[in-house]
Amino acid sequence: MSRILIVYHSQTGNTEKMALAVADGARRIEQTEVILKRAQDATLEDLLESEGLAIGTPENFGYMSGMIKDFFDRTFYPAQDKVFKKPYVVFISAGNDGTGAQRAIERIALGYKFKMVYHPLISKGKLTEDDLEKCRELGSTLAAGCQLGIY
């Protein structure tokens, strides 16, 4: 049994739809438990007890959302040296190009020593069914890799 933590923040509902699709994809892999939490509700224990992490954020002013940053702020020092090479993926709902949010998350993930296992998924503009299918694939890929122990 592997546990996948999906931490997200959503203002307009787009990132939440993406998070639900990531969760749906992860649940397609047998013996996978999915923990889906808004960033403000996610805890250090959630992070430490997961085998894989998916982080979802809207792009706000070219950066990640403040609630995702808050999650990182609350968990960084207590989790340091306890999450070495934890596999993670990122999904971003962007009005612009999303790269500012992506870079910010990647810099913080380096400090945690997380291991990115799939390229960031950035949905630009209006969310499409194709975007949601890519989110499901993202969730399945993360869950399958964790389940098989290849990350």
Model-predicted segments: where are they?
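Residues at alpha-helix caps and immediate loop-helix transition turns in enzyme cores, especially N-
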Residues: M18, M67, A101, D131-K134
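Glycine-rich phosphate/pyrophosphate-binding loop and the adjoining helix
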Residues: I29, T43, K115-Y151
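Short hydrophobic segments within beta-strands
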Residues: V7-H9, K37, F91
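N-terminal beta1-alpha1 ligand-phosphate binding loop
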Residues: S2-A26
